[in-house]
UniProtKB/Swiss-Prot annotation:
Domain of life: Bacteria
Reactions accelerated catalytically: tRNA(Cys) + L-cysteine + ATP = L-cysteinyl-tRNA(Cys) + AMP + diphosphate
Enzyme Commission number, as recorded: 6.1.1.16
GO molecular function per UniProt: ATP binding; cysteine-tRNA ligase activity; zinc ion binding
Protein name according to UniProt: Cysteine--tRNA ligase
Amino acid sequence: MIKIYDTMSRDLREFVPIEDGKIKMYVCGPTVYNYIHVGNARSTVAFDTIRRYFEYRGYKVAYISNFTDVDDKIINRAREEGITPQEVADKYIAAFREDVTALGVKPATRHPRVVEFMADIIRFVEDLIERGFAYESQGDVYFRVEKSHNYAKLANKTLEDLELGASGRTDEETARKENPVDFALWKSSKPGEISWDSPWGPGRPGWHIECSVMSTEILGDTIDIHGGGADLEFPHHTNEIAQSEAKTGKAFANYWMHNGFVNIDNVKMSKSLGNFITVHDALKTLDGQVLRFFFATQHYRKPINFTEKAVRDAETNLKYLKNTYEQPFTGNVDAQELQNFKDKFVAAMDEDFNAANGITVVFEMAKWINSGNYDASVKQALADMLEIFGIVFVEEVLDAEIEDLIQKRQEARANRDFETADQIRDQLVTQGIKLLDTKDGVRWTRD
């Protein structure tokens, strides 16, 4: 039985899908105006792992993750680079795909873009106006927060808290609102900015309405799981809930999931603070699987500190698992012990996708594998577990010269010519091949 920590209820809940055997899942994707940083990547990796585990447990997952390709940040970047907003979005979508592929992330079932849904967004806003949940003001359209039942329930805030925080605002936009806490559904455009025609004049959608429309248009009014980083609880996901439920009268999502931050020196990694490392740069010195494995060392909801030591530890541990996977697996299977490991792994992951505990079971299994010689079914079980974390080992093929040297060493040992055997062993070490003689035969690892 899979249990999920639901941000809305703030407790572990048994997962019950809307439709047996199927899951509808929407995860907020990047605003494509720059390379993603390691903190952004954690969210992508965390929900990819969750999706993979659902599939491991037999579910068919419709996994949607959007590209926000209409945003003020994209407009500003276009001015800086002297290109169009569309060209900015295309450039960084391509960069995102390249980065997450290196991290072993599966493509979403669909990656919708805001520009594909402009007509749907306008209809959605019109509907909210007709229902009295939204109003036009000088070409902008705002959502009436006070009309929303239990607004900000996801963030555990009250409307009174928000109104108190907004008191005293005197900026131009606030003057156009009925209430300072109302948020934009549609923004009128300034001269020269990218815009779309609408009943309220040329403009572009607000950030929050984009995800509501893409989710409901593709997956329907109510989905199983909505996910994203912890910083999206408020205001983004809060506003998604308000506008979606105002339109449909139904629960927007049955489970809300949020991943923790990546910290540097215990401070959240963010572009606004300037303390970030892009995945594009990190991959110049790190293997993508190492970074991916680093994320798996901590529960997805908890913050994780990005340090050189932590990353190097992940690299060492991943190498150990790779060497384990490359054993010959020519022996017999201990079916009961293998099943015990599978059961322990499922128990760990069923408890809110606890990757850290799941990885602990994988290492226990690796230790067991290295203590004997088992058959290919054990190797497959190890591969299946690792694949959930996006770790896929490609077995290295020794070139003919090295294979010949290993065979000659075996013959020398059989003839008790240990001097020659040792010379060959030392020669292989210089080529990065380390041999291990066991009761079940010779094994090798690549340093």
